[in-house]
Structure formats: C-alpha cells, structure tokens
Amino acid sequence: MTTQALPTTKLFDFRTLNLPQAYLGLVLLFTLLIIPFADAAQGNTVRGDYAFLSASELQHNQQSIAQNQASKETIRAYQQLLQQADKALQRLDQSVTDKSIVPPSGSKHDYLSLSAYWWPDNQKSDGLPWVRKDGQINPASKNADSDGVRLADFTAQVQALTLAWYFSGQQQYADKAISMIRTWFINPQTRMNPNLDYAQGVPGIAAGRGTGVLDGRYFATRIVDSLIMLRQNTRWTAQDEKQMQQWMTEYLHWLQHSPAGKKEAAAQNNHGNWYTVQVAGIAWYLQQPQRVVEMADLLKTKLDTQLAAEGSQPLELARTRSFHYSYFSLQAATLMAQLADKVQIDLWRYQTPNGSSLIKALDFMAPYSDEQTTWPYRSLDHMGVRLVPLMVQADKALGENRYQRWIKQADFTVIAGKEGAKRKGVVTEALRDTWLLAVTPQQNK
C-alpha cells in the first residue's frame, strides 16, 4: 500500500467551516492522511506505521470531527489540542544549548538535568553531597538552568503541533513542529548530542546516573510517532529524515551500550519498564522489529519481579507517591504491550510465575480511577483519571469491555485553585489519549 501525502497548501480549518455536513464529508475523503499498518503476519515494520498510535482510530476521529459527528469529549480534546498548538506557534524553538549550567564535558550540546528528589544537605556548610527526600521535588531541578523541563516541554509541543496539523490540515502547525525538531536534533549550532550522560545528576554524588535514562522516554512516546506522521508532509525533507535516522541510531546505540543505559536496562522497577519502551519505540522508528521483540521479552522478566499475585506492585507501593508510581510503571508496561502486539507478542495475557499479569495489575488499580475511592496506601497524590487511557487500550487488545464501567464514569473535570492547576495537565492528556487518539466503544455506536 502506498501512502498519500497531504497537500502543502493551506487546507480547511474545521473550526471555521460552516458547510453542509455531506459536503464536508466529501472534503474529508480527499484530505485524510492514509498511513499503512505493519505487516503483522511477517513481523515487519512498514514505513509509515505508527509505534503507539493507531492510523485507523486517528482517521475515525478526524472524520467524525469534520462531519460534526464527534462526541462532546472528542470535540473538547480537539479544541484543547488546537489551543496548545496555537500557544506553541508563539514559542521560540528550544535547544539544550539554552541552559546556563555547562555540563562536565564542557559542551552545552550535552543534555543535563538534576534529579528531582535530591536536596542540599542542610547539615553541611556546602550542602554536599545532596540527600534524597522521596516525593519532595527540588525546584532547582525544574528551572531553565538545566534541560529536564525543557525536554518535556519541547517534546509535548512537537507532539501537539504535529497532531494539530493532522487533524486540522493547517500547514503552519507542521512547519513549526519541523522547525522545532531541526533546532533540537539537527542544526549544528543547537543540536543535542545523542546521549544522556549527565541526566539526573546529584551534586556531590554523580554528574549523571542510570536513572536519568528515564528523561529520554519522550523521544519514544512523543517524538517517534510525530516523525512518522511528518513523513507525510512534503516540508519534511529526505535530508531531515536521514539526519533524524542518524541521530536516533546513535542514541539507540548509547541506550544499549553505555554504562547508564545498561544500568537502566537492569532496573527492576518502573525505570526498567520505561527502558523497554524507549528502546523499542526508537527501534520501531528505525525499522528494527527484532529489537522490539527483545524488549518485549525483557519486559516479561520485569513483570515477573514487579507483580504480586493479586496485581499490586510492591516496589512502587513502597514509594511516598505510591499511586503515581504504580500507575507510571503500568503506563510503560501497557505502551510496551501495544508495540509488542505489532510483532505478534501478547504481553497483555502473559502470566508471571506467581500467576499475575498486566491485566491483573490493571484490575488491581481500576477501582481507584474513581478518585472518590480512597487509595489504601501512603501517597502524596491520587489522580485516578490517568488510568483511563490504559484501560481503553486494554479493552481494545482483549476485545472485550472489561473496564467499561470505569471508563464511562471517568471524571475529566478541572477544579479551580492550586489543585486544579496541577490537575489540568493530567486531565488534558488523559482526555486526549482516550477520546482523540483512540476510539472507545461509545464512539463506535
């Protein structure tokens, strides 16, 4: 199957059209982005197949929006996406060279971040070495002096812009996404070197740590599918593609062979799960399906260690943010399961030696997607709506409505005040993943 590229001339903005529904449907047929699926029977990636998104579900929701048949939840998610993309249009392109701290290498092209839960020791005159306070975020790790927040922000903007282009057809969004990608990865003056040698450093202990590999997860979960989607845009050049392939190839080598990467590969908690997602997602982009198989097998060994018989995750329950980390670990496992499906490996139904499984882990957490149901463990936060996209993907994979009760009653409201501000981003992401980037049974009715 060949793919069709969207025209580079400005397309219709579905927010402003006031055309008959039937005509709008005909317009859509000529503007839909057609991206082929993987040749699953052969276990081969096909150029253009997404890693974590579904082409058919994206097309379904794009068409429902254009024909004024989308659910109110889908419309809300779409409007929020455009708002985020419009804000991104006004932002300057970001680069690792923007930071004020110079890494030990002497090059600002090397990524640098500070570990969030480490603080100066107030018992020491120089504060060194820093000490760990689990769950308490040091503001010094979240400012522009280092790259941690910058990387998360940059990848979120690229993802929003690329999706906004896909759903609206407006070329300005793709142009900005491409510009941001070139600035971060390609342009010699601003590019990031393909390593995380100085990620999640702790003053007085280490300039960088294996746990810092986690920072790069967004390269897989946000950038990979954006790159695949942008292949359909003629402004994304063959040279762009070649240089991104080279960057990702070098970064994947670093992930697999650096001391930090090897340490993260051996991690038994959520870090190990995210390592598999990161390697597998980038390998998928580079058309290396065997690497995906290897990461699926590696995740099985993680689940064997992580999951108790009833589906709880004792390593994550021991944390001060036990709900967050139980969800966070499970999020990585479900993403890996989605990608493993494309190489004919069923991680959803895989059983650990003690009879547990990814589904049992979801079963264990599902009731707490309702935030009125008290999470019975110590936890500094409980944002249950995060679980909803995971349950949607599980139901799709299982071919049943196992979690429909929880999906239907999901609370996507945002309250006012400080707590509402914290919740807004979580709700926006969960709503998008559930209603715009996926198709629920309610949408198929």
Report residues per predicted region.
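Bacterial N-terminal signal peptides
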Residues: 23-36
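Extracellular glycan-targeting catalytic surfaces
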Residues: 41-261, 297, 341-342, 351-445
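Loop-centered beta-sheet repeat module
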Residues: 247-283, 289
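Active-site-adjacent structural elements in folded domains
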Residues: 144-145, 234, 238, 256-267, ...
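Generic detector of N-terminal low-structure segments
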Residues: 14-16, 32, 39
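An alpha-helical repeat/solenoid feature that recognizes helix-turn-helix modules
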Residues: 212-219, 272-273, 326-329
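N-terminal secretory signal peptides that target proteins for export/translocation
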Residues: 1-19
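Long, repeat-rich segments with strong aromatic
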Residues: 277-376
